[in-house]
Amino acid sequence: MKYLYLEITSRCNLRCEMCFKQHWEDEEGDMDYDLFLKILDDAEKFPELKMIYFGGIGEPTVHPRFMDMVREVKKRGFALGISTNGTLLTDEMLKELAELGVDLVYFSMDVLPTAQNVVTLGHILAGVTAEKIKKLVKYREEVGTHKPSIGVEVVVTKENYKQLPELARYLLNLGVDAMLVSNLLPLTPEQVNDIVYDGSIDMTPIVNELYKIAHNGLYIKLPYFELKTERVCDFDENKVAVIRWDGEVVPCYRFLHTYREYIFGREKKVNTYSFGNVREKSLADIWTSERYTWFRFITKNYLYPSCTDCSLRDACDFVKTTDIDCWGNEPSCADCLWSRRIVMCPIPQYNFGKFL
């Protein structure tokens, strides 16, 4: 295991329509602190572990002991990454993140922070998030370590795709290190009309402009904007495990919760899938279990069908859920837009002495 993702809470202070959280069937909750400490104890058994990452489908800063958790991770010597909308981070918290040497913070922002830029699907309060980024840049300069690295996650829709180059320039001038661009994964039939990877939009000019901006020092990670044959599971390739707030160990974000998604307009039920609970077993026992090891072997070698471009997909019952595919794999990754790099996995890369 090289990356361990912790969903320390599934609650959030915002209500963004494109978020899984608005459409899943699961209950909300916070990871209790004793369980968190047990997970850190278990994590110390993995010598190749590069980073612990506070993420999942919740807002980590909502957790009442968020800063205690940050301090504990850094006290134990782990690298720490955090995904956040940033709106609850106070000046004191931002300053302490820099002083503690938190390694990476990714903020969510989908448009330029101007009054006229209001999107119906994207993350709201872009102006507030931008101010938090400015302050974090200031505090890390005062500390003098250039930590944390700062990234921004952007979800592309028909509402904001034309703004991507301008947003990239803005982030570069703001002092941001990385920009992760991902496509919208529709969670309602209406959202299908907002995707840009169905051939309705020519993204080539936008992509070319973004590459030019990247040469100026902004690390930009882009998705594909059309369906391609190649499949790459970043969660599996980077040896990632994800632990839900209640202790369930899942292989990736896609299987973290139960919800409905729309693959090029076709409805699919995604059912959460766990390989065990760290309340009952050690993380090492779960990670090395026969079932989890076999799953990683299957996904690593892509020994599963491709439902997305199968000619039988509209007449097949297997594609209706992620429970099983026509090759007998449980759960099924055969319809995953994350492995197609249409939806981007938020896995950091270690480049030039820092995580991005």
From Swiss-Prot:
It comes from the Archaea. Its cofactor is [4Fe-4S] cluster. Keywords: 4Fe-4S, Iron, Iron-sulfur, Metal-binding, S-adenosyl-L-methionine, Tungsten. [4Fe-4S] cluster binds at residues 12, 16, 19. Pfam families: Radical_SAM (PF04055), SPASM (PF13186). Binds 1 [4Fe-4S] cluster. The cluster is coordinated with 3 cysteines and an exchangeable S-adenosyl-L-methionine. GO terms for molecular function: 4 iron, 4 sulfur cluster binding; catalytic activity; metal ion binding. Residues 1-214 form the Radical SAM core domain. Belongs to the radical SAM superfamily. Involved in the biosynthesis of a molybdopterin-based tungsten cofactor. NCBIfam families: W_rSAM_matur (TIGR04317). PANTHER family: RADICAL SAM DOMAIN PROTEIN (PTHR11228), TUNGSTEN-CONTAINING ALDEHYDE FERREDOXIN OXIDOREDUCTASE COFACTOR MODIFYING PROTEIN (PTHR11228:SF34). This is Tungsten-containing aldehyde ferredoxin oxidoreductase cofactor-modifying protein.
